[in-house]
Amino acid sequence: EKTSEFDKWLRKLNDLRAKAKILLRIQKLEKDEHFGDCEPVGDGIRELKINYAKGYRVYFKEIDGKVIILLIGGDKSTQQKDIEKAKDIWKKIKK
């Protein structure tokens, strides 16, 4: 599952190679649940790092080792803002 914010971010991403790498990484998550380079950022939200170009990030909520929702994406330059946005999105969803 993914949010409209995540869809919007991915649609606006102009770097097609980066978009392909991000989608492939998400697909791997869905198939074998191997998170790879990933860290908790608070409130049960995790940051998936895609080490390519700008250092893309995907923020998601995970329960019992399974990704349940893709919240938002960004890159290294907007990391702190994206983490706060992901937390806000999650708070709205769980209400």
PLM feature spans:
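Short beta-strand motif preference
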Residues: R57-K61
